[in-house]
């Protein structure tokens, strides 16, 4: 299927503030991906991890193949008040997980530890808000090996860059190595749960979280909610 779908969502701002109208242009994929069993999906991912991993290579894989829906049921864990990260596959080079988003779920504003990332929507929809860090009072903490930042700032200046609507059949959301910072929301007014599939290279064990109200940032664990169900 090909074509363009224009969708307009009006999102209420803070009390007393202006209402913000966001227009999204959603490009559908040119052709439907091939549906394969989860074991084959994992085997193909494992094969990719043995070669040179590029942003385009994983992107091409995820638009070409999708996991058979019934195979994903055993990876789903739902909590009423927060999203869950459920591991499908992980080795030294790649990590694949299913994230379940209850109504109203929202992530904190966070980095990705300098790694590559890909997200494809399976059910529902998600709003991604992208940011850029302009300044902080601990710039020296970014000069470390093996992670994007030690965190610990008590003054942070951020700029919002844009907003993306992620839907099944739409373009993949990607994370690059240039310290992509974003937060993801399943808006309450949509009144539906959401499910997304994520791949990271390399696996992300921790990330920097930004609390703009308290003007601080800190590192926190990015471990999955439950162990892998793979055989």
Residue ranges and their predicted role:
Residues 207-231:
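C-terminal edge-of-domain segments
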Residues 108-110, 128-129, 174, 181-188:
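Short beta-strand His + acidic residue motifs that chelate non-heme Fe in jelly-roll/DSBH
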Residues 118, 190-206:
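A short hydrophobic beta-strand segment most commonly corresponding to one strand
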Residues 103, 114-134:
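Glycine- and acidic-residue-biased ligand/ion/polar-headgroup-sensing regions
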Residues 8-70:
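N-terminal leader/capping segments at the start of a protein or of a new domain
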Residues 98-111, 177-178:
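Conserved short histidine dyad/triad with adjacent acidic residue
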Residues 134-179:
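Short acidic-glycine-tyrosine-enriched beta hairpin
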Residues 74-103:
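A short glycine-rich, His/Asp/Glu-containing loop-to-beta-strand
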């Amino acid at each position: 299927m090909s074509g363009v779908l224009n969708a307009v969502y009006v999102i209420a701002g803070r009390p007393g503030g202006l209402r913000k109208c966001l227009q999204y242009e959603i490009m559908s994929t040119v052709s439907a991906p091939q549906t394969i069993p989860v074991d084959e999906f994992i085997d193909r991912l494992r094969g990719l991890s043995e070669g040179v991993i590029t942003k385009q290579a994983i992107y091409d894989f995820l638009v070409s193949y999708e996991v058979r829906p019934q195979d994903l049921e055993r990876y789903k864990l739902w909590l009423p008040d927060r999203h869950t990260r459920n591991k499908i596959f992980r080795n030294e080079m790649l990590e694949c997980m299913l994230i379940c988003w209850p109504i109203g779920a929202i992530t904190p504003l966070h980095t990705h530890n300098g790694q590559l990332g890909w997200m494809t929507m399976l059910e529902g929809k998600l709003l991604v808000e992208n940011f850029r860090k302009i300044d902080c009072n601990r710039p020296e903490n970014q000069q470390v090996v093996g992670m994007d930042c030690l965190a610990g700032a008590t003054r942070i200046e951020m700029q919002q860059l844009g907003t993306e609507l992620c839907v099944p059949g739409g373009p993949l959301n990607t994370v690059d190595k240039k310290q992509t910072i974003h937060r993801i929301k399943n808006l309450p007014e949509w009144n539906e749960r959401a499910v997304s599939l994520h791949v990271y290279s390399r696996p992300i064990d921790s990330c920097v979280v930004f609390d703009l109200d308290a003007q601080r940032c800190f590192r926190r664990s990015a471990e999955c909610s439950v162990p892998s169900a793979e055989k």
